[in-house]
Amino acid sequence: MYHIWIKFLAAWIFLKRFNGVHVMQAKAPMYRNEPFLVFWNAPTTQCRLRYKVDLDLKTFHIVSNANDSLSGSAVTIFYPNHLGVYPHIDDRGHFFHGIIPQNESLTKHLNKSKSDINRIIPLKAFHGLGVIDWENWRPQWDRNWGSKNVYRNRSIQFARDLHPELSEDKIRRLAKKEYEKAAKSFMRDTLLLAEEMRPDGYWGYYLYPDCQNYDYKTKGDQYTGKCPEIEMSRNDQLLWLWRDSTALFPNVYLEIILRSSDNALKFVHHRLKEAMRIASMAREDYALPVFAYARPFYAYTFEPLTQEDLVTTVGETAAMGAAGIVFWGSMQYASTVDSCQKVKKYMNGPLGRYIVNVTTAAKICSRVLCRKNGRCVRKHSDSNAFLHLFPESFRIMVYANATEKKVIVKGKLELENLIYLRENFMCQCYQGWKGLYCEEYSIKDIRKI
């Protein structure tokens, strides 16, 4: 009964947010007057330091760490071997730290995690994205299918070894109970520790929430992109995780089979829609900021996204009201000077220009529609309205000389442009502001700083 009530409440909040007059308030953006941010989370330090190739990230409005490193003050990602003693089996079949969470000391894990956080993020005033990437197992028993079924089997054997007197049915039930209890403790306590140590960071788990809408390979033209109801229900049951998160990090990685297809947009749209639904149910005071993880190249390839798929990923993420998008990449991006040059060429071409287009359009809409006190969100989440610069009114110009490169957007908003924005977008006000256009200051809604 409890889960039914939670699901009803989440659906009601979501409908009110996207299709009604009231929109749940948002946390103020990480940087003032920057409603939509683009982050770089790829290990491309070698491009700059070894090959002397500057990817021009800042030129194109991309937030990155010093020397374009994988982790730093802007965004830090913790892989399994970077944070505490995370029990798991890796892709090669190697065992780590007891394999299952109920077979490892939580105290030992938290003590090690504290040391790791101090080492990796020495700045106590850290204000960036803190992303924990634990993908080996899921905290819900029923979601450990396929290769993850090993965690269920190990848990059953663990319970059997401790309680040989129990029947197999009781052992299975005990194994599920103990596994989910330990998994919850590991994930929740790790998150709370990170937030206690670096309270100004945006903390959450990569790929949470997930939508499990991966059936585009088998459905073809019948693919809808919608998240299965059972998966949405399971996400509802993770309310404990959403309540303790300060940001959500779903992914919208595109495989090459989706290139420039309708299915690509369906896939991304419904993953974002589910993330926005969860963001609205996590807290009572504001919707959690959503930062979608994307790749500038198709997954498992070094082929850049088409212009259409840049719209599908970056454009869709901005239009749905996310706080930003994070471009993740592999070591391949900086493996050779040619790789670095390929990334740079893409950055100086379609990728960089489109990022400038969307980030600038989001700022303009925030200014003219929401008085810089909120971000623009589609009035109807399933529409095809995007936050793009109007080509008849604006031009993106790149200037470069021997010492610097800069991008300038020239133009002004025309009346018909403003009408379009008002017809297709509404304001999601930041905390402390309310009204149709975020024009009313509300002291009682201001968060404590």
Swiss-Prot record:
InterPro entries for the chain: Aldolase_TIM, Glycoside_hydrolase_SF, Hyaluronidase
Class of the enzyme per the UniProt entry, highest EC level: hydrolase
Entry annotated with the keyword Ribonucleoprotein: no
Tissue specificity remark: Expressed by the venom gland.
Described function: Snake venom endo-hyaluronidase that degrades hyaluronan to smaller oligosaccharide fragments. In venom, it is not toxic by itself, but increases the diffusion of other venom proteins by degrading the extracellular matrix. In addition, it displays antiedematogenic activity.
Domain EGF-like stretches: 427-438
Family: Belongs to the glycosyl hydrolase 56 family.
One GO BP: hyaluronan catabolic process
Keyword set, alphabetical order: Disulfide bond, EGF-like domain, Glycoprotein, Glycosidase, Hydrolase, Secreted, Signal
Gene3D superfamilies noted in UniProt: Aldolase class I
EC number of this enzyme: 3.2.1.35
GO molecular function annotations of the record: hyalurononglucosaminidase activity
One GO cellular component term noted in the UniProt record for this chain: extracellular region
Location of this chain's protein in the cell: Secreted
Family matches, as Pfam families: Glyco_hydro_56
Catalytic residue positions: 135
Main location: secreted
SUPFAM superfamilies: (Trans)glycosidases (SSF51445)
UniProt organism field: Cerastes cerastes
Quaternary assembly: Monomer.
Glycan attachment points: 67, 103, 111, 153, 357, 401
Positions of disulphide bridges: 47-340, 211-227, 365-376, 370-427, 429-438
Signal peptide region: 1-23
Protein name as annotated: Hyaluronidase-1
Substrates-to-products reaction catalysed: Random hydrolysis of (1->4)-linkages between N-acetyl-beta-D-glucosamine and D-glucuronate residues in hyaluronate
